[in-house]
A protein has these predicted regions:
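ATP-binding/phosphotransfer module of carbohydrate and carboxylate kinases, centering on a glycine-rich
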Residues: 1-4, 23-27, 46-53, 94-225
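N-terminal short beta-loop-beta anion/metal-coordinating cradle
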Residues: 1-13
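Hydrophobic pocket-lining residues within nucleotide cofactor-binding pockets
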Residues: 12, 185-186, 231
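Phosphate-binding/catalytic loop of phosphoryl-transfer enzymes
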Residues: 12-107
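Conserved small/polar residues in nucleotide/adenosyl-binding loops
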Residues: 227-234
Length: 238
């Protein structure tokens, strides 16, 4: 029998949402449930019980200052329209904007239309009229990963990551605490991410694709056996 279930998911920050989701999980598992946010999962996975600045770069982006127990400061992410600097969705948004206006290199644009088998009108349709446009935009980041040797693409990535530092990381006491990253985009662009961090005088010692291994270590240190752990693979990490 499970003694405890820990569930981490996107948007699980309010008491109302935690209670609703927790009640559903209690009915399913018949055991005590603790529901927390994906951001706390990132912080615990990256830092265990140490203090530091945890950052997520995936489809979306987020960050927080974690004191080793709880999140004490969080710069609001804002979503891919008003924020999410450094994320795959925002990188894709800027690239597609340049593509639609003919500002991206012709060779890169031609390869994009060939590989995605999509027209400019279909791009507009995917962004404005279909579900989950942020996920569509984020898929562009995987395409761009093959073109980092192109000056235009490289600068696009650099600018996106630099905006994450200036608008998010720099709002924390980043000179006095370690900074670590998790998420598919952070992991895919790790060398460039380290380069941008270096411009801010930051040395990154940890960049993970997911927080799961660190979370397992965290809970093995803080809970008894027979605990079930689930970190929902949200847009933040993917």
């Amino acid at each position: 029998k499970l003694e405890q279930v820990y569930y981490y998911g996107a948007g699980c920050t309010s008491y109302e949402k935690k209670n609703v989701l927790g009640a559903s999980l209690v009915a399913q598992f018949k055991t005590p449930i603790q529901v927390e946010s994906d951001l706390l999962a990132a912080a615990r996975g990256l830092f265990k019980c140490e203090a530091g600045i945890a950052c997520i770069l995936g489809t979306g982006s987020n960050s927080c200052f974690y004191n080793g127990k709880i999140i004490v400061k969080n710069v609001r992410a804002g979503g891919y329209i008003l924020g999410d600097e450094g994320s795959g969705a925002v990188l894709g948004k800027h690239f597609l904007s340049d593509v639609l206006k003919g500002l991206a290199p012709k060779e890169v644009m031609a390869d994009f239309f060939e590989k995605f088998r999509i027209s400019p009108n279909e791009v507009m349709e995917s962004v404005y009229n279909r579900p989950f446009p942020n996920r569509f935009l984020s898929t562009i980041s995987y395409f761009l990963a093959d073109y980092t040797s192109d000056d235009y693409v490289y600068e696009l990535i650099i600018t996106n990551l630099r905006n994450f530092f200036t608008r998010n990381v720099c709002q924390y006491d980043y000179k006095n605490y370690p900074i670590r990253f998790v998420g598919s985009l952070a992991y895919s662009y790790a060398p460039i991410l380290r380069e941008v961090a270096g411009d801010f005088g930051i040395e990154l010692d940890v960049i993970e694709e997911t927080p799961m291994n660190g979370l397992i270590d965290f809970h093995s240190l803080n809970t008894v056996s027979y605990t079930h752990l689930r970190a929902h693979e949200t847009d933040s990490y993917l």
